[in-house]
């Protein structure tokens, strides 16, 4: 592996380099979003409409047996469905009535798959009619394998659910205040006992564990900002009200479709901010929200310094090391920015799909971070070709490769340290306090490699 890297002085005019290949994708199917969304939305039921292959994938990927009675199920398509010999509406009605009788959820989410796309099942046409008959809302989301990354399944579901949010009725006085928000000095408030400041409504979107939701909400409350709701909420009946006067901000970089729906369909105003991953990203996320809502942020610099001090045990392990992102879950840009701030060199940042408008603030912060740390700008490759990537890995010899599960073992067999990118999807990585979990995941293969080197040098006696 490469030794400590000393980078030359970087030209301040240097910018990020973007490339696009036509690579193949080794990633999970987007219907895997069911695994975390059915737990997040507690009164929901997810019905995946697909073939036996979809059922096998969900059974193996989620690891939940039928005896556990999870709040999701498979509606398996048979040959008669594909050849149009069966009435799709009657079959779906029978299943939904059974779901209502057994579970009585507040909402049923139909997840379309590749097969429903190919045979042109009119799920959107059947859902409203069936919804009135059974008396339960039905949300249709086509989270199929035609997307670029498996995390975009959540994006599809949230975009469909955003259309079901109630409309917020704005008053004339509120509209005037929104057009010219006044900067509110937040320095005189006394911690949690302070009253919430007057500001436009704010809704955050992105599925996070309840503990992380509470932490991010509390961080904004400390600045005097009230969060009017989250999309998705823990219960479908508690969806936030949306409208022209509402500001929205995302917490994940793979929610560009949801952001577009909120702006176009619900007329919300999007706060384009970096994502709250790492101390630097969390601070920038809070500061951008405060600036847009007209609140002067306080105490964030000291808060960030304390978090960096708590990471001192991890930073020496990553400082000067190199990392290569093959691209899997669309979190690559945010993780590359945070690891660059930690002192790592990012050779390449592969990403399955990049919405430059939605991730504009994140890309700008990555560029600024590289200039401040005096390191080369990473090469950002959209839709990377794995064959060419492996050639570049052999040439660059990075200390760590963050890749999907399909490519991890072959790379390990060639003596390359790898980390499963899917672990960052399911770990709690958002907010100030969870920065340690990110570095714990990154340093684990590095520490394992160091232990192997030590054991080979000191514990094995040379043959006489």
UniProtKB/Swiss-Prot annotation:
Record's function text: Component of the dark-operative protochlorophyllide reductase (DPOR) that uses Mg-ATP and reduced ferredoxin to reduce ring D of protochlorophyllide (Pchlide) to form chlorophyllide a (Chlide). This reaction is light-independent. The NB-protein (ChlN-ChlB) is the catalytic component of the complex.
EC assignment: 1.3.7.7
Cofactor(s) for this UniProt protein: [4Fe-4S] cluster
Principal subcellular localization: plastid
The name this protein goes by in its record: Light-independent protochlorophyllide reductase subunit N
Binding site for [4Fe-4S] cluster: 29, 54, 114
Family: Belongs to the BchN/ChlN family.
Subcellular location: Plastid, Chloroplast
GO molecular function: 4 iron, 4 sulfur cluster binding; ATP binding; metal ion binding; oxidoreductase activity, acting on iron-sulfur proteins as donors; oxidoreductase activity, acting on the CH-CH group of donors, iron-sulfur protein as acceptor
Alphabetized CDD domains for the sequence: Pchlide_reductase_N (cd01979)
SUPFAM superfamilies the record matches: Helical backbone' metal receptor
Keywords: 4Fe-4S, ATP-binding, Chlorophyll biosynthesis, Chloroplast, Iron, Iron-sulfur, Metal-binding, Nucleotide-binding, Oxidoreductase, Photosynthesis, Plastid
Catalytic function, reaction form: chlorophyllide a + oxidized 2[4Fe-4S]-[ferredoxin] + 2 ADP + 2 phosphate = protochlorophyllide a + reduced 2[4Fe-4S]-[ferredoxin] + 2 ATP + 2 H2O
Cofactor note: Binds 1 [4Fe-4S] cluster per heterodimer. The cluster is bound at the heterodimer interface by residues from both subunits.
Cross-referenced InterPro entries: LIPOR_BchN/ChlN, Nase/OxRdtase_comp1, Protochl_reductN
Pfam family, one: Oxidored_nitro
Pathway connected to this protein: Porphyrin-containing compound metabolism; chlorophyll biosynthesis (light-independent)
Gene Ontology biological process terms, A to Z: light-independent chlorophyll biosynthetic process; photosynthesis, dark reaction
């Amino acid at each position: 592996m490469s030794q400590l890297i000393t980078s030359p002085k970087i030209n301040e005019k240097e910018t990020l380099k973007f490339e696009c290949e036509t690579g193949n994708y080794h990633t999970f199917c987007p219907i895997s979003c069911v695994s975390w969304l059915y737990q997040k939305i507690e009164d929901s039921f997810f019905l995946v409409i697909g073939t036996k292959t979809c059922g096998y994938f969900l059974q193996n990927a989620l690891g939940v047996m039928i005896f556990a009675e999870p709040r999701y199920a498979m509606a398996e398509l048979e040959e008669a469905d594909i050849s149009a010999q069966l009435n799709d509406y009657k079959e779906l009605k029978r299943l939904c009535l059974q779901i209502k009788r057994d579970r009585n959820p507040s909402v049923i989410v139909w997840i379309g798959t590749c097969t429903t796309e190919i045979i042109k099942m009119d799920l959107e046409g059947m859902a409203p009619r069936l919804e009135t008959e059974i008396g339960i809302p039905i949300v249709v989301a086509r989270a199929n394998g035609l997307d670029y990354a498996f995390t975009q399944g959540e994006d599809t579901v949230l975009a469909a659910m955003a259309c079901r949010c109630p409309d917020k009725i704005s008053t004339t006085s509120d509209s005037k205040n929104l057009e010219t928000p006044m900067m509110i000095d937040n320095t005189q408030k006394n911690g949690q006992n302070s009253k919430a400041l007057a500001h436009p409504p704010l809704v955050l979107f992105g599925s996070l564990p309840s503990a992380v939701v509470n932490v991010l909400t509390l961080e904004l409350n400390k600045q005097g900002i009230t969060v009017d709701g989250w999309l998705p909420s823990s219960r479908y009946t508690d969806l936030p009200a949306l409208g022209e006067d509402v500001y929205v901000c995302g917490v994940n970089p793979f929610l560009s479709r949801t952001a577009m729906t909120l702006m176009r369909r619900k007329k919300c105003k999007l706060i384009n901010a970096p994502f709250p991953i790492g101390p630097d990203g969390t601070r920038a996320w809070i500061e951008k929200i405060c600036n847009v809502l007209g609140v002067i942020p306080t105490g964030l610099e000291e808060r960030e310094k304390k978090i960096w001090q708590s990471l001192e045990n991890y930073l020496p392990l990553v400082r000067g090391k190199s990392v290569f992102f093959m691209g899997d879950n669309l979190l690559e840009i945010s993780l590359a920015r945070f690891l660059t701030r930690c002192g790592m060199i990012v050779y390449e940042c592969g990403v399955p799909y990049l919405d430059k408008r939605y991730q504009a603030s994140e890309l700008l912060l990555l560029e600024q971070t590289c200039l401040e740390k005096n390191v080369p700008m990473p090469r950002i490759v959209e839709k990377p070709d794995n064959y060419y990537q492996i050639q570049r890995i052999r040439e660059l010899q990075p200390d760590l490769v963050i890749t999907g599960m399909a490519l991890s073992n072959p790379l390990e067999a060639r003596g390359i340290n790898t980390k499963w990118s899917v672990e960052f999807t399911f770990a709690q990585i958002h907010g100030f306090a969870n920065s340690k979990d990110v570095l714990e995941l990154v340093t684990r293969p590095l520490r394992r490699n160091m232990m192997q080197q030590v054991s080979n040098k000191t514990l094995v006696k040379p043959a006489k």
